[in-house]
Amino acid sequence: CMEPDIFQKIVDASEVMTTIGGISSLSQVAGIACLEKCRYWLNGFIKQVQENRDYALERLRRMPVVCCYKPQATFVLYVDISALPMSAERFTKIAREQYKVAVVPGGATFFGPGSEGHIRICLATSHEVLEEGLNRLEQALRDLANDKVNG
């Protein structure tokens, strides 16, 4: 980075404990690209994340037992699954083990007690990967709504 003040802010921010111990790898790569490469990369990335966000919101609105609002500035969706008869942590385990889709649970461990009943979905991926993940998530939710899930 050509600007020492900006570079130091990035270094300082990376030392702050977040969900997994600092700034995510995705955020670090995006920051480097934004600061050292070309603005066109950032514009393309933002466009892709916005398209993925809009697609995911459209899909989620048709799924049972979930609620999700349009975020203003992030690469994740925070989905309310509190209508399910289980914790977010239990749901993410079922989703991962039985439906082979990974989502991050809310809860005191990472996001504070007010985040229980929510899951996070990452939008910073290809449309194809997002579509497949949403297909699997939808199947898990439909099966849970119809009591077709083991465990």
Task: Give the location of each predicted region.
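PLP-dependent enzyme catalytic core of the Aspartate aminotransferase-like
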Residues: 94-103, 109-151
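Conserved glycine-rich beta-strand-loop-beta hairpin in the small C-terminal domain of fold type I
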Residues: 32, 48-57, 68-81, 91, ...
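Conserved core segment of the aminotransferase class I/II
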Residues: 1-50, 57-59, 141
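Short hydrophobic/aromatic beta-strand micro-patches
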Residues: 1, 78-80, 122-124
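A short linear hydrophobic-aromatic micro-motif
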Residues: 21, 64-68, 102-108
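Flexible glycine-rich beta->alpha loop in the catalytic core of nucleotide-sugar glycosyltransferases
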Residues: 5, 108-109
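Surface-exposed helix-capping loop/turn segments at secondary-structure junctions
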Residues: 40, 60-69, 145-149
